[in-house]
C-alpha cells in the first residue's frame, strides 16, 4: 500500500486519541475502510463508538500533518513500507491471531521474500525470547539454536532486546545471507528509533542479510514500557511457535508465551537447574503444558507437518545446559500482568546486561552459572591462566559462593 490517500487515512485512524483496538475493529466492521470512517456524520459514528470517540474521529489529530509528512519521506527510502489490514502484503499469520495490529511499518530489502512468507507462510517462522540477563550457557544456546533453526530453513523472530533476543538475532545471522531462513526483529518503538542504542549495528546487519525489522508504532515513538508487551503479541502471532530460553518468573517472555498460547501457537521451554532464578518461568511454563525441549531439532520436529515444506533439517543436535531455579505452581495466574509490566519496564530501561547488584561480581562467577561446569570449559570461556582460575575458584569456594563437585566440576551456589 503506497497510495497517499490510503496511507493518510490509516495513519489518521491510528493516531486518533481514545480509539483503541476494539473500537477500531468495530469501526472497520461497520464502514470497511478508514477513509469511509472519516466521511461519516457524528450520529453515524456514535452508533458504533462513544460520543467522545466520535468527536475525536471528526477532528484531525494533533501533529497529524507533520506525522504524515515524516511518513511519506520515510517511505521514499528503499526497502521501507507501510502495510495495513487488508493489504495483500499483510502477514496472514497475524490476521489469524487474536489481536492483529492495525498497520505495520516495515524495513526489508527483499520484498519478494517478505511477500512469500506473508502470503504463503513459507519459510515458516519461529519466535525466540528469553532473559535480558542470560547466563553464558543460555546466551550460547540461544545463538546456537537460532543458527541451527535458520540453517534448517526457518526464520527466527525476536525483539532486538538485550540478552537472548540479541543472541537469537546473531545466531540467525550466521546462516547464509539472503537464504530462506533469516532474522526478523519486532520492535517496540518507531522504526526511526533503535532501542537499545547499542543494537544499531545489529539492526543494520539484519537488514543487510535480507531480514526484516517491523513495528506497529508510528515513526518517532520512543521506548515506552507499555509498548513492549504489545510488541510481544506480534512475535507470538507471526510464528508457528515460541521458544523460551531462561525466563524468570516475572519475565516479559512469559507474556509472549501466554499470548502465543492464546493464539494457538506452540510454546517450547528449555529446562535448567532448579537452583537458578532464571529457570522459574521456563519450569512453570512446562508445568502448564509447554513442550520441554533439549535441542533445536526437537523444536523443529515438534511443529505441524504442513510447516515442513522446503525445510532442510539440520543434523547437529546441540544439547542444552542451562541455569535455573525451582519454579512455582502457576506463573500466569499467580503473577499479575501488572507486576510483569513493572518488571518489563525495569528491564527495558537498562542499558547494560548487568544490573547494579551484579556489576561487582567477578567474570568467573558470572561465567559459572548454576549448572555444573568443568575447569576446561571455564578456561575456554575466560581469559584466565589455569593457576589464576584455580586460585579464584578456591576463593569463591571459601566464600561459600561456589561448590566443588565430583568429577572436577564446579557449580555456583548464590
Model-derived regions, located:
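Glycine-biased, small-residue-rich flexible motifs in mid-sequence functional cores and linkers
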Residues: 1-6, 84-414
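Short, small/acidic-rich helices and loops at N termini and domain boundaries
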Residues: 1-89, 399-401, 407-408, 413-414
Amino acid at each position: 500500500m503506497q497510495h497517499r490517500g490510503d496511507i493518510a487515512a490509516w495513519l489518521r485512524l491510528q493516531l486518533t486519541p481514545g480509539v483503541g483496538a476494539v473500537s477500531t475493529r468495530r469501526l472497520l466492521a461497520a464502514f470497511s475502510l478508514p477513509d469511509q470512517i472519516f466521511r461519516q456524520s457524528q450520529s453515524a459514528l456514535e452508533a458504533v463508538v462513544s460520543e467522545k470517540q466520535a468527536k475525536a474521529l471528526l477532528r484531525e489529530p494533533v501533529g497529524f500533518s507533520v506525522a504524515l509528512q515524516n511518513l511519506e519521506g520515510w517511505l521514499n527510502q528503499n526497502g521501507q513500507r507501510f502495510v495495513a489490514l487488508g493489504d495483500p502484503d499483510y502477514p496472514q499469520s497475524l490476521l489469524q491471531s487474536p489481536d492483529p495490529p492495525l498497520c505495520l511499518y516495515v524495513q526489508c530489502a527483499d520484498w519478494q521474500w517478505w511477500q512469500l512468507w506473508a502470503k504463503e507462510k513459507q519459510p515458516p517462522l519461529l519466535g525466540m525470547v528469553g532473559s535480558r540477563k542470560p547466563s553464558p550457557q543460555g546466551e550460547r544456546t540461544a545463538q546456537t539454536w537460532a543458527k541451527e533453526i535458520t540453517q534448517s530453513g526457518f526464520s527466527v523472530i525476536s525483539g532486538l532486546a538485550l540478552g537472548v533476543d540479541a543472541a537469537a538475532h546473531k545466531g540467525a545471522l550466521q546462516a547464509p545471507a539472503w537464504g530462506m531462513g533469516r532474522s526478523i526483529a519486532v520492535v517496540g518503538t518507531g522504526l526511526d528509533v533503535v532501542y537499545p542504542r547499542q543494537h544499531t549495528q545489529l539492526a543494520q546487519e539484519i537488514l543487510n542479510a535480507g531480514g526484516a525489522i517491523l513495528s506497529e508504532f508510528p515513526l518517532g515513538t520512543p521506548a515506552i514500557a507499555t509498548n513492549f508487551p504489545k510488541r510481544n503479541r506480534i512475535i507470538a502471532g507471526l510464528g508457528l511457535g515460541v521458544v523460551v530460553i531462561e525466563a524468570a518468573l516475572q519475565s516479559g517472555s512469559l507474556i509472549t508465551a501466554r499470548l502465543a498460547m492464546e493464539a494457538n501457537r506452540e510454546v517450547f521451554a528449555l529446562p535448567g537447574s532448579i537452583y537458578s532464578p532464571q529457570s522459574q518461568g521456563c519450569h512453570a511454563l512446562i508445568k502448564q503444558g509447554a513442550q520441554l525441549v533439549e535441542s533445536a531439532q526437537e523444536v523443529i520436529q515438534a511443529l505441524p507437518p504442513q510447516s515442513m515444506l522446503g525445510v532442510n533439517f539440520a543434523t547437529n543436535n546441540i544439547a542444552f545446559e542451562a541455569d535455573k531455579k525451582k519454579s512455582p505452581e502457576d506463573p500466569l495466574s499467580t503473577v499479575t500482568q501488572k507486576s510483569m509490566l513493572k518488571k518489563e519496564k525495569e528491564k527495558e530501561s537498562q542499558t547494560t546486561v548487568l544490573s547494579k547488584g551484579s556489576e561487582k561480581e567477578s567474570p568467573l562467577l558470572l561465567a559459572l552459572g548454576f549448572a555444573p561446569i568443568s575447569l576446561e570449559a571455564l578456561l575456554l570461556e575466560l581469559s584466565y591462566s589455569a593457576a589464576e582460575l584455580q586460585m579464584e575458584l578456591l576463593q569463591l569456594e571459601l566464600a561459600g559462593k561456589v561448590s566443588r563437585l565430583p568429577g572436577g566440576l564446579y557449580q555456583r551456589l548464590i
